[in-house]
Amino acid sequence: MKPVLQGALAWIYAGYKTASRGHLLPYTRHQKFHSSSLISEQAKRAKDLIKLVNSSSLSNSESQSLDWRSDLKVPEWKRQKLALKDKFKGQQWNPKKKLSREQMENVRLLKRHFPETSATELSERFQVSPEVIRRILKSKWQPNEEEQLQLQTRWKRRSERVNEILGSPEHQKLPPKKLVLGSGRTDTDLQVKSVRRTAVKAGRNSSSPKGKQKLNLLSKLIS
């Protein structure tokens, strides 16, 4: 283990001792060396050190005890943090995925044609929990004619908005092309290397003298 990492971990784990007067006094040099040697024995890699730090943290010890629920001295922000940690059981934030109606119908269709398929296999396919698949298969709700008409009307409005956005002149206008010409050291003829599309900047005057000279040169080369 590197000396710098040992020193940093020794500083983390050494902590402070509370004196009788209420002041905080650091540990002695012997205690720091002893704590760093214990850390190097318990954790050999950086991942093990991170796990060791998290397991010995104050919030972890507080979450394991049930006194924080009845302790009025615990601040509200820490109470919410411990409650979320208890709810998710240490897992990272992973919001549930919501399936659309078409995907729900696909789940029912797959289960109807392949009855031997389990809920776990379907959940892996649709990237949801098996409980979601069980609820979908258990549900017998079907939209009536009025609800189906409302759904179709809503999807029609969405498609019209998408077509309006894609059909606007800004999306239909293609950027102008730019010819990249080049020749070898021994060749006398110019060759087109590539054709690039360049976006025209706003407020740029295309009828400038420099642009006209380039167009005249290009027309002579092509002819």
UniProtKB/Swiss-Prot annotation:
This is Required for respiratory growth protein 9, mitochondrial. Keywords: Mitochondrion, Transit peptide. The keyword Transit peptide applies. GO terms for cellular component: mitochondrion; nucleus. Belongs to the RRG9 family. Pfam families: Neugrin. Coiled coil: none annotated. Residues 166-223 are annotated as: Disordered. It is found in: Mitochondrion.
